[in-house]
A protein has these predicted regions:
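PLP-dependent amino-acid enzyme catalytic core
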Residues: 1-102
Length: 102
């Protein structure tokens, strides 16, 4: 059964939440065999890396796959990350680029 977790609002608002919808749980159980967690600071670092090195502006949820790949780079398996979304508040982006606390 789905579990309810603590949720803290952040700029990574496109993913996450308190739980999976009950109707979706059977599908999730079939398709997902695990999950990885990163901090908001790790996602901010991924947003900054994408902006500075690749000139790509990704929203928090869009940069989360890169944050996970960087946090778990010790695995020997190839990784592909889908980076998406540019819906990031300009002030939040500026704070990320200045490496300020969010």
């Amino acid at each position: 059964a789905p579990q309810t977790i603590d949720y803290v609002a952040s700029f990574v608002d496109g993913i996450g939440g308190r739980s999976v919808l009950a109707e979706m749980w059977p599908l999730v159980r079939q398709l997902v065999n695990g999950s990885l967690v990163v901090s908001v600071n790790e996602v901010a670092a991924a947003v900054r890396l994408l902006a500075e090195r690749n000139r790509v502006i990704a929203e928090g949820a869009g940069a989360a796959p890169l944050a996970v790949a960087l946090a778990h780079a010790d695995t020997a398996k190839p990784v592909a990350c889908v980076v998406s979304g540019g819906n990031l508040d300009s002030e939040v982006l500026a704070r990320i680029l200045r490496n300020e606390t969010l």
